[in-house]
Amino acid sequence: MSTMTPREIVSELDAYIIGQSEAKRAVAIALRNRWRRMQLPEELRQEVTPKNILMIGPTGVGKTEIARRLAKLANAPFVKVEATKFTEVGYVGKEVDTIIRDLTDMAVKQIRKIEVEKNRMKAQDAAEERILDILLPRAKNKWGETEYEKDSATRQVFRKKLREGALDDSEIEVDISSQMNVEIMTPPGMEEMTSQLQSLFEGLSPSHSKKRRMKVKDAMKVLIDDEAAKLVNNEDLKQKAIESVEQNGIVFIDEIDKICKQSDRGGADVSREGVQRDLLPIIEGSTVNTKHGMVKTDHILFICSGAFQVARPSDLLPELQGRLPIRVELKSLTKEDFERILTEPSASLTLQYKELMKTEGVTVEFTPDGISKIAEAAFHVNEKTENIGARRLHTVLERLMDGISFDASERSGESVVIDEKYVSEVLNDVVDNEDLSRFIL
């Protein structure tokens, strides 16, 4: 779990996302509260429930990007899902329970990685012994049993060479344990049955080893992973993963506005109101059956987001609104925001294009007036057509860089300055013609 303070979390998000300080503060506080809760006495800890968040804002202002960056900062089980992928129980499509199953699978992977790292030193020693056994087979007694006597002088010499890398390029044949992978194809909506059948068949198939010929340095890596996996207790791992999900799990549900029931629509809304009803018990707190065990969702943090351009937050079921007490509104981006997006983030769009062209030997330089003109063009097209936020910058920049990207391999050693004049020459015809900008930008 992340031990970062809210200020540190916001500072980390600022490196990638421009503006939206209110949304950053809300997720930073929610993430820090996960840590605060774990410091409380057991009895009080059970009473403190997470305050779920609803992020409201037009497309392209940073809702999904906040989720992506939060996943890296959280250091906890985190899953991002699209609300539109789910349907009501009984219909063809994914059921909402799969959210918790995916979250548990994610936690198992995380914990397994941690456990493998913990056992890496022991695994390294075991892998070293296995390689030495191949290079210098141990003597056998008269009954054919291997004798594990104290290391001989020759074995010590080979051990020293192995550690110094003198044997790295020697080829050896190693036994790698492997288990049969079973792939089962089922229709959508039957994920639970799939995982149960998969577990059953994997349990029935015996693990066996296969011989592979490789260099000593490659064999060492493979054998370390093999030995580390053997040292991990799967039952303890599952228990830790379930506990991690229950206490620290975070679920980000995007496009929640798309499952609002619209009053002007008739007929059955299979993927709308029914999905909301199915989400209620999971967000409120229930027990979900997964292949790793039963998972309680009482203390999982849910962050929902939506553009709410057609629907309104009040169109959500009242019970669901009550389970999302913290509302955060993300603001539309201005021309100044676009300028900052082009230059300030640690992996800004202009930097990406510069580095891409540098691989071909072409030096690209963006001047301040050129960046201002690009931002103005993107903002202007957003105003005249559909407002898709910062995503418009990708489209405008691709159009702007089209000629340079195409000819880059033949222009090695050249320098290109992208200033206001250059941007105007390339983009003005498209930006000023509303019909063209609607289809091209």
UniProtKB/Swiss-Prot annotation:
Q: Which GO terms describe its biological process?
A: protein unfolding; proteolysis involved in protein catabolic process
Residues reported in the UniProt entry to bind ATP? 18, 60-65, 254, 319, 391
Keywords, A to Z?
ATP-binding, Chaperone, Cytoplasm, Nucleotide-binding, Stress response
Principal subcellular localization: cytoplasm
- Name the Gene3D superfamilies on file: 1.10.8.60, DNA helicase RuvA subunit, C-terminal domain, P-loop containing nucleotide triphosphate hydrolases
Q: Which family does it belong to?
A: Belongs to the ClpX chaperone family. HslU subfamily.
| Location(s), subcellular | Cytoplasm
> How is this protein named in the record?
ATP-dependent protease ATPase subunit HslU
Identify the species of origin.
Actinobacillus succinogenes (strain ATCC 55618 / DSM 22257 / CCUG 43843 / 130Z)
Q: Which HAMAP family match?
A: HslU
